[in-house]
Regions:
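Bacterial N-terminal signal peptides
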Residues: 1-7
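Beta-propeller folds
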Residues: 8-211
Length: 211
């Protein structure tokens, strides 16, 4: 599939004009060094310039893909590759084994657990049931040292914002604990499993969330 993509790109690149990315002079001094960054304006992702840039890039991409004569064959090859069982590297915590499994038909892999070496596997967490439309995904997990609790974060609609929850591993029930507005953060359990460390932000303004 990768070879087909490269060939199709070389055949069509000359027929397209890439959207320009404006360079806006900007510099700042950081620890005694002057940093030049002509694309700093892109960091304001809610600005009119940024949203216009994203729209032009998306339009260019869709125009290219739409005219790609290998589109259907590539999609067919990818479906064949993905339509198969897959299992992640298992890991153990306090003699319990955890791993992700997908039979090829699920949108998201399920988190499985074996409570002991001789025990049968069971589904610990099924992110496919988080929402009916499949827009809520499992982002990351962290098992407590005694393997009694699972901290897991979810993402809604592909957002970088994460909501952390805690699952009782034995009962499979989600506890009332809930941490919102986390981003780019893991969960590190205390040695005595009394809690875990994480990073979060203040709740964004409604205006920012709408954008």
């Amino acid at each position: 599939a990768a070879l087909l993509i490269l060939v199709s790109c070389s055949n069509q690149t000359d027929n397209f004009e890439y959207p320009e990315s404006n360079k806006v002079p900007f510099s700042e001094e950081v620890h005694g060094y002057v940093i030049e960054d002509a694309y700093r304006w892109m960091e304001d992702f809610t600005s009119e310039d940024s949203t216009d840039w994203v729209e032009r890039q998306n339009n260019f991409t869709q125009k290219f893909i739409g005219k790609n004569k290998y589109k259907k064959s590539i999609a067919k090859n990818l479906d064949e590759v993905w339509d198969t069982d897959s299992i992640s590297m298992p890991y153990q915590v306090n003699k319990k084994t955890f791993y992700y499994f997908n039979d090829g038909s699920w949108q998201q892999s399920k988190l499985m657990i074996k409570d002991c070496d001789e025990c049968s596997e069971r589904v610990l967490l099924d992110p496919n049931k988080f929402s009916e439309d499949g827009t809520i995904s499992l982002a990351s997990t962290s098992v407590s040292n005694d393997a009694s609790l699972l901290a897991f974060s979810i993402s809604d609609g592909g957002s970088d914002w994460r909501t952390w929850k805690v699952l009782d591993i034995e009962s499979g029930k989600t506890l009332d604990d809930r941490i919102e507005w986390a981003k780019f953060s893991g969960a590190s359990w205390e040695n005595d499993d009394s809690g875990f460390y994480y990073q979060r932000y203040d709740e964004p303004s409604e205006e920012l969330l709408k954008d």
